[in-house]
Regions:
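Non-catalytic cap/lid and distal C-terminal segments of serine-dependent acyl enzymes
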Residues: 1-199
């Protein structure tokens, strides 16, 4: 465990954070680049677009049957893919017709607070306090995000930083002047720290 780490970018960064939060008995180091945090901001903007796209397709089941036929996942189509994928992960329901619950009503478009509450329970910023002992046990916790992240993840990273500080969780938080894409060069900031901590 003391020599095992995990890192990732975007949704992979989210996964790395969750491994540190929930499985610190297996991992001693975590590095997250632009990981999903503070779901109100990072997913909130896609919700209305997903409503429009799924409704125009004739509902969720019909959209699921046809979405792969699109040449480009641009604009509202990407928003729909994002929200449907997140729904399958954050709000699975084997009794639902498609196996998961959407965070909104397709009929009215209104948000479903009970489903969004399930999502929020998987948001790293909401888990810091309860999992602070696990995070404190890490030999390295690194996270960063560009100040121009298109999914507003820089706000989530900053909130995560403040929550970690409030819970006395040692961590390295960095900001940089860039967006969400093509930031592989940022591994030069995290991997040396992770490597030194795990040797």
């Amino acid at each position: 465990r003391d020599h095992r780490g995990v890192f990732g970018k975007s949704s992979g960064g989210y996964g790395a954070l969750m491994m540190g939060l929930e499985h610190s008995e297996h991992f001693a180091g975590v590095a997250s680049h632009a990981g999903d945090c503070y779901f109100e901001y990072c997913y909130g903007g896609d919700l209305p677009h997903a409503v429009d796209t799924l409704r125009a397709a004739g509902g969720l089941a019909r959209w699921l049957a046809t979405w792969r036929g699109h040449d480009r996942l641009a604009g509202t189509m990407f928003a729909a893919v994002n929200i449907v994928a997140m729904s399958a992960f954050y709000s699975p329901d084997p009794t639902a017709p498609c196996g998961f619950e959407l965070p909104f009503s397709l009929d009215s478009g209104e948000a479903r607070p009970e489903v969004l509450a399930r999502w929020k329970r998987r948001d790293p910023v909401e888990l810091v306090t309860a999992h602070a002992p696990a995070l404190r046990s890490l030999r390295c916790l690194f996270f960063d995000c560009g100040d121009r992240d298109e999914y507003h993840l820089h706000h989530g990273a900053r909130i995560l930083h403040f929550r970690c500080e409030a819970a006395s969780v040692p961590h390295v938080y960095q900001r940089f002047d860039d967006g969400h894409r093509s930031i592989g060069y940022r591994y030069k900031a995290s991997l040396p720290l992770l490597t030194r901590a795990l040797l």
